[in-house]
């Protein structure tokens, strides 16, 4: 893949991670959630080192509403929502391994119930990214 003046960019890199949870967790807890997700992105999905872009948002109880029993999964107030926007192209098996790695990591390190880990992957074409400078770094220059 020719990326113009950014030859080291990989087509599958650049996840943007949004983490939403109820307010009241410590800074250390929120930081650990971000680190666990980042490690799973590195280890399972092959995201390059330092490709870390996360937005962690706390919400009041009225600002985070969800069905507590949808699909037979019993969620508590500790439920966290992970929305990860990333380039298209990963297999279903790889995605399933990623979901498991995140849920396992959050359970093992933070004692978060696996039922309280809600993950949504949003896949986009590579031209939908601008890392700054008003440029689409994954797209070959047309000039």
Residue spans for each PLM region:
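Short, Lys/Arg-enriched N-terminal segments with co-localized hydrophobic residues
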Residues: 1-13
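Interaction-mediating elements
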Residues: 13-143
């Amino acid at each position: 893949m020719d990326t113009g003046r950014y030859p080291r960019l990989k087509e599958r890199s650049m996840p943007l991670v949004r983490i939403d949870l109820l307010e009241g967790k410590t800074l250390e807890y929120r930081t650990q959630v971000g680190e666990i997700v980042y490690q799973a992105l590195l280890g399972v999905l092959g995201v390059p080192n330092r490709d870390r872009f996360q937005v962690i948002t706390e919400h009041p109880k009225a600002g985070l509403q969800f069905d507590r029993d949808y699909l037979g999964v019993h969620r508590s107030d500790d439920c966290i929502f992970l929305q990860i926007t990333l380039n298209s192209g990963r297999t279903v098996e790889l995605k399933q391994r990623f979901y498991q790695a995140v849920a396992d990591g959050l359970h093992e390190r933070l004692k978060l119930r696996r039922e309280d880990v809600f993950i949504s992957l949003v896949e986009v074409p590579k031209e939908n990214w601008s890392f700054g400078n008003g440029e689409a770094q994954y797209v070959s220059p047309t000039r």
